[in-house]
Amino acid sequence: MGIITCSNVTKKFGDFTALNKVSIDIPKGEIFGLLGPNGAGKTTLIRIINQISLPDGGEVFFDGKPLTPGAVESIGYLPEERGLYKKMKVGEQAIYLAKLKGMSAAQATKELKEWFVKFKIQGWWDKKVEELSKGMAQKVQFITTVMHKPKLLILDEPFSGFDPVNVSLIRSEILRLKAEGTTIILSTHNMESVEELCDNIALINKSNLILSGNVDEIRRKYGNNQKEIIYKGQVPLNISNAPVKVVSDEPFKGNRRAVVEVVSDATNAQILSELIKDTEIVSYQELIPRMSDIFIKLVSNN
């Protein structure tokens, strides 16, 4: 059993079913992608895990035990809609939020000062939140989310509003936290981040779980047995004797790039042995679909 296990979780709002018997298991120490289009039910599930809302059916377990309000101290939650108090000073507010998570003022001050040095924001301590830019405020909220060293960290669109430099900074911190044993739920529409960061994912659409599993295994499963061939020449690829059909063939950086689909059980060695008779091959590799393509395909067909 993972750090979070949801078994047949159902949530209704009147006649509307927001979650319909959703079952997922989130392994410890991993980055787990919680995916789905707007309105799919992701936020409802996050609110249930955070004890903000209760399920109408099913069970939720935290670290092998039924989820209780006391588990919240072991969870850090960064919502998509940020919520710092604009009139409070940054340091004062951060200490207040840390105390809500069970830290003493002394512990919080020590931890915060280390984070402020790491993020190079020492001069922000006495600033009011309303004086900060959106990106600056998001840095502060990220710190307040992680400073109590939660077992489980839930990040809802954590890179939203950040410039590339700060995206890289936050991504590095997420990977460091994972390396230290923190389990992270990443809720995002950015499929590039999913491919880069996530070990496993769950895809929810229209209140139902429609896909779950390891990211690399899912990408291979939804492949079309296609290969990418970069080759020298100015004319289209000669495939008269190769067991493939051409999907596309076009100029590419001084060479040509062809995408072919294997139409038999031929091995890569057999395919290449036919191609190299008439063509100088620069590169040959399996073409694995992007998570964005899989997301669009499944959500559109569901």
Which stretches of residues belong to each language-model region?
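ABC transporter nucleotide-binding domains
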Residues: G2-I4, K11-N205, L211
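Alpha-helix N-cap/helix-start and coil->helix boundary motif
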Residues: T10, T68, G91, I184, ...
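Short, charged/small-residue-rich alpha-helical element at the C-terminal edge
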Residues: Q226-N302
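ABC transporter nucleotide-binding domain
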Residues: S172-V260
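Solvent-exposed polar/charged
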Residues: T145, E195-E196, R220, K277, ...
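Residue-level recognition of well-ordered beta-strand positions that form the cores
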Residues: S7, D25, I230-K232
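Short, Lys/Arg-enriched, disordered terminal segments
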Residues: M1-I4, S300-N302
